[in-house]
């Protein structure tokens, strides 16, 4: 097997017992939207995954890695153009943005129970931070703008159990079936917010 299957921890026993395996990827996305006077843009660059696997002893292997679990990357702005309003207040603009996300750090081990059937166990640690902010500004100094936002820091633990069964379907074919069950994850953390004008 030339690839790491990070979805099912039981799959990591299907490998050369003398080799180390690693996988790394990155992703990038640039988006810009505009409708009337409203604009939105986001630029993201993140790891896709980082994983490596090592053999432990015969018919057993281990794997560890890091991958994004969720992400937030947006920014939009718009202006008030109604002459009846800005004639008194001056130009008004609103801007909002959000960045950050959660990552999953994991470690797994698997063993062949008997020919074709393997069992894998995985420990997951979730962590990350999200920042969101909102700004309201006036060009007329007689009016106060507003700024508010918050930072959320979260972490939690979870697990996964995987099974995989492989059998031959001919001289050059094989069929692989697998299943995983994940435990519920209860995230905890703290929120720091601010509001001022």
What is each of the regions a protein language model found here?
Residues 1, 55-197:
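Outer-membrane beta-barrel porins/channels
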Residues 1-73:
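N-terminal, post-signal peptide beta-strand-biased segments of exported outer-membrane/organellar beta-barrel
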């Amino acid at each position: 097997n030339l690839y790491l299957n990070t979805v099912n921890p039981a799959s990591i026993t299907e490998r050369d017992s003398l080799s180390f395996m690693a996988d790394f990827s990155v992703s990038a996305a640039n988006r810009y939207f505009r409708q009337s006077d409203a604009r939105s843009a986001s630029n993201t660059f993140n790891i896709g995954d980082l994983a490596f696997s090592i053999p432990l002893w015969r018919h057993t292997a281990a794997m560890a890695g890091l991958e994004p679990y969720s992400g937030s990357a947006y920014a939009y702005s718009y202006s008030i153009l109604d002459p009846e309003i800005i004639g008194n207040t001056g130009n008004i603009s609103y801007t909002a943005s959000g960045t950050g996300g959660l990552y999953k750090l994991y470690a797994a081990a698997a063993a062949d129970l008997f020919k074709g059937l393997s069992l894998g166990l995985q420990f997951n640690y979730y962590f990350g931070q999200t920042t969101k902010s909102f700004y309201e500004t006036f060009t007329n100094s007689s009016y106060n703008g507003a700024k508010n936002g918050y930072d959320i820091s979260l972490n939690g633990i979870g697990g996964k159990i995987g099974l995989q069964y492989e059998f031959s379907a001919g001289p050059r074919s094989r069929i692989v079936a697998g299943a995983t069950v994940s435990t519920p994850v209860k995230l905890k953390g703290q929120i720091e917010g601010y509001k001022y004008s």
